[in-house]
Each structure stands twice: as C-alpha cells, then as structure tokens.
A protein has these predicted regions:
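Alpha-helical tetratricopeptide repeat
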Residues: 1-255
Length: 255
C-alpha cells in the first residue's frame, strides 16, 4: 500500500519513470491488482511507452468484467501501437452505452473519432504509396503519427518500416539509414530489419554488402521471399557489373 501511494504521488508530480518503479514494487505483492495495473499503464502512457501500457491494460481486464475506465485506457494504448481497428472494437461497449458513465461514453466518442481519423490517414498513406507519390504518402503518415503525438522513434514498428521505405524512395538516404539502424539495434535477428539495411546498402550502390545482408536474412529465415527476390536482383547487378568491367578491359586491350 505504501508503494502504491508513493506511485500515485510520483505520478501527480509527473515523475512517471519513478512512478512505474513504485507501481511495479507494489505489483510484486499484488500481481493481479487491476487498479495497480491500470495505474502503471497510465504512467507508461505518459512516457509514450504504449506497448507496455497496453500489456498492463490487457492484464487488468483478464478474467474480470472490464470497467469503462479500463476500456478507454486500452483503446488509447491500441491507438498508440497503431491498431485503430482494435481500438474501435474495444470501445464498442462504451459507444453502445452498455457500459461506463456518461462522461466515459463521451470520452469514448472522442477516442472513436481519433481511431477513425487514424484509419483514414493510414489508408491514404497506402494509396499514395501505390501511386508512387512518396511525398503525400509521407504527409499522411505524419498525420497518423500526430494523432497520438508519436515520432518515428516512438511509432509502431510497422510504421517505422514504412517511414524507412518512404525516405528511401524520396532519396533521403541518411535519414533512412539512421532509422533503419535504430530498428536493427532493437532486434539484430529480425529479418525485416536486416532487409531494410540491405535496401539502403543497394541504394548507396554497395551491391556486395547488400547481397551479404540478404544472405544473412535467408540464413535466419530460408523461406523469406522478399530476401530471395532481393538476392537474385543483387546477383544480376553484380553479373552486369562484372560483364561491363570485362568489356571495358577487352576494349582497352584492343587499343
């Protein structure tokens, strides 16, 4: 109880990391306390750590009737991890007025509007990408991020990958490489992250290193089709390069 109160006090003073530690200490004594889990999720949300916050919300409602407060918080976390469809589903008991106070139902309508707006921006980003309008696709992704005040660093992994590809297509190789390295450092065994690096190497005309990266991805996931196709492309480029070099040398010897 002392740790819980300390966590509440720290949260009120905007010391969110310390509040997380206090709630974690309290949860070691009451691991199934929905109140503590929701309190810690609020602290995680304040830190922009929506994945951890969502995990706490899911534990808080597991095996019990969820409160309106819990569903609202969960829906916001789902938006924070880029899952507007899930947020809309979570909000449905509040929107149908089957659960929650009138104030919670009003908040649910606001979050519902945010979820639908996020859906629209993501759909727009995909549509512009198919049209190869990389600038407008980037703007749409910016707008999707803005709903939950996300940055490229705090965005969901799938959005980070979208951003890297958009930066590549727009010729911003330095920014693309920086974000791709952040993704890779988070999980060096992730084949998607490895292939992002390979694409950047190819864009930098380092075909040999790009080929090696695709081979690494295939060692980790032999069935990865994207890596297989990319490897074939790199081999074809190296063959063209070798043929061009051979032709150049032959021409020089003829002279």
């Amino acid at each position: 109880e002392e740790a819980k109160q300390r966590g509440n006090d720290l949260f009120k003073r905007a010391k969110y990391s310390e509040a997380v530690q206090a709630y974690t200490e309290s949860l070691s004594h009451e691991p199934e306390s929905d109140v503590l889990l929701l309190n810690r999720s609020a602290a995680y949300m304040a830190l922009g750590q929506y994945g951890q916050a969502l995990a706490d919300c899911e534990r808080a409602v597991q095996g019990r009737e969820p409160s309106g407060k819990a569903l609202l918080r969960m829906a916001k976390c789902q938006l924070g991890v880029g899952r507007p469809d899930a947020a809309l589903y979570t909000l449905s008991p509040l929107l149908s007025q089957a659960l929650g106070t009138s104030a919670e139902q009003a908040q649910a309508r606001d979050v519902d509007a945010q979820a639908r707006e996020m859906q629209r921006h993501l759909t727009t980003a995909d549509a512009y990408s198919r049209e190869r309008n990389w600038t407008l696709a980037s703007i749409a992704l910016d707008q999707a991020q803005g709903i939950m005040k996300l940055t490229d660093a705090t965005s969901p992994r799938a959005w980070q990958e979208k951003r890297v590809m958009l930066l590549l297509q727009r010729g911003h190789l330095g920014q693309a490489q920086s974000l791709a390295m952040d993704i890779y450092r988070a999980d060096p065994s992730d084949t998607s992250a490895i292939m992002l690096g390979a694409r950047i190497m190819l864009a930098n005309n380092d075909v040999q290193k790009a080929l090696q990266q695709s081979q690494l991805a295939l060692r980790l996931d032999p069935d990865m089709q994207a890596a297989k196709q990319f490897l074939r492309k790199c081999k074809a480029l190296l063959t063209l390069k070798d043929d061009a070099n051979a032709a150049f040398k032959a021409n020089r010897s003829d002279d």
